[in-house]
């Protein structure tokens, strides 16, 4: 059998074998068997050198044609198998539109946010408007305008985070309370009456415990006008507590001291966790302080642009986290900043 006849036979055999290659692995094996360096076509090409010189051109041309035919057939088979694989993957990934859909996860408001919105609603119905004030304050607004000049001993009531500033610049700090917002609200409204609440974050360098955090929310409130008395303050706070905790809630006022109010009081609610029996949250007193309050000091009124001979006013500052602890029965304020979904999903 001549070399050309052998090439014809090999070509037919290879094409027939290619038709039976069912996947890309089989194609790779076929390519190695027929077109590889040690494949059938390469072995047959070694006989070209033994042919007479006049037969070599025709045999060489047939050899090249056979290789081209097999390579083209391989490319077509490979493309066809890849298309089939893609189609199979597409069909396997198809979505059954008759299946019920998956509802997106529904988020929840943080308990502090819920409490803040409740406070806004209750006090908003009493005529208080929400104001915002800076979290980074000057020493002047955080202390001096609130009747605490430099070296005043009352400054020790707040462990303060100070901000580094250039020499000659005003002293900056992270506000220790929302009370500086009083001055902004007063100066924007004086000499007219004003009722405002000022919510926001506060910062104090304190040891973190079940009752205290270094960062916490506070809501400041002020009411200024003619003939406003302590009775108005008491009525406002009691009405607020009854709206928030129910008509039967037990409350009490205790004398206290704040440099920006005179007289000053603490407003307590009976501990809901222990029913007044005493627990670690209420320090075994049976009561939990939720806010401090008092009549605005005349000096603060003057700094806000009001004449204390003509008007008076009261102020209060409450902690939404502590109030939420009472409302939801939470025994540790650290849960509010834990980010633990097991805690947050309960609200």
From Swiss-Prot:
This is Phenylalanine--tRNA ligase alpha subunit. Disulfide bonds: none annotated. Its EC number is 6.1.1.20. The keyword Manganese does not apply. It holds the Pfam family tRNA-synt_2d. The lineage of its organism: Bacteria, Bacillati, Chloroflexota, Chloroflexia, Chloroflexales. NCBIfam families: pheS. Tetramer of two alpha and two beta subunits. PROSITE patterns: AA_TRNA_LIGASE_II. Mg(2+) binds at residue 262. It comes from the Bacteria. Keywords: Aminoacyl-tRNA synthetase, ATP-binding, Cytoplasm, Ligase, Magnesium, Metal-binding, Nucleotide-binding, Protein biosynthesis. CDD domains: PheRS_alpha_core. It catalyses: tRNA(Phe) + L-phenylalanine + ATP = L-phenylalanyl-tRNA(Phe) + AMP + diphosphate + H(+). SUPFAM superfamilies: Class II aaRS and biotin synthetases, tRNA-binding arm. The keyword Aminoacyl-tRNA synthetase applies. It is an enzyme of class 6 (ligase). It is found in: Cytoplasm. Its cofactor is Mg(2+). GO terms for biological process: phenylalanyl-tRNA aminoacylation.
């Amino acid at each position: 059998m001549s070399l050309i006849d052998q090439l014809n036979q090999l070509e037919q055999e290879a094409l027939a074998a290619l038709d039976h290659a069912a996947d890309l692995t089989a194609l790779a094996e076929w390519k190695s068997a027929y077109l590889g360096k040690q494949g059938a076509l390469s072995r047959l090409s070694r006989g070209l050198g033994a042919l007479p010189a006049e037969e070599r051109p025709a045999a060489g041309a047939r050899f090249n044609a056979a290789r081209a035919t097999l390579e083209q057939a391989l490319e077509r088979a490979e493309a066809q198998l890849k298309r089939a694989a893609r189609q199979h993957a597409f069909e396997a990934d198809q979505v059954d539109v008759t299946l019920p859909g998956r509802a997106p996860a529904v988020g929840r408001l943080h308990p502090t946010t819920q409490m803040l919105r409740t406070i806004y609603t209750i006090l908003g119905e009493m005529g208080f408007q929400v104001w915002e004030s800076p979290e980074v304050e000057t020493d002047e607004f955080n202390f001096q305008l609130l009747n605490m000049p430099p070296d005043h001993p009352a400054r020790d009531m707040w462990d303060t985070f100070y901000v580094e500033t250039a020499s000659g610049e005003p002293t900056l700090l992270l506000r220790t309370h929302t009370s500086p917002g009083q001055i902004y609200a007063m100066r924007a409204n004086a000499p007219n009456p004003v009722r405002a609440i000022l919510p926001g974050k506060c910062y104090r360098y304190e040891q973190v415990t079940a009752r205290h955090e270094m960062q916490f929310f506070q809501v400041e409130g002020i009411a200024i006008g003619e003939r406003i008395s302590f009775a108005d303050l008491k009525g406002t706070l009691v009405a607020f507590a009854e709206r928030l905790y129910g008509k039967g809630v037990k409350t009490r006022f205790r004398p206290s001291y704040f440099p920006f109010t005179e007289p000053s009081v603490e407003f307590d609610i009976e501990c809901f966790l222990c029913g007044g029996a005493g627990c670690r949250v209420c320090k075994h007193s049976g009561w939990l302080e939720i806010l401090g309050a008092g009549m605005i000091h005349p000096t603060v009124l003057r700094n806000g642009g009001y004449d204390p001979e003509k008007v008076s006013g009261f102020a209060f500052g409450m902690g939404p986290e502590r109030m939420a602890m009472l409302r939801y029965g939470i025994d540790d304020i650290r849960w509010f900043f834990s980010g633990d979904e097991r805690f947050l999903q309960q609200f």
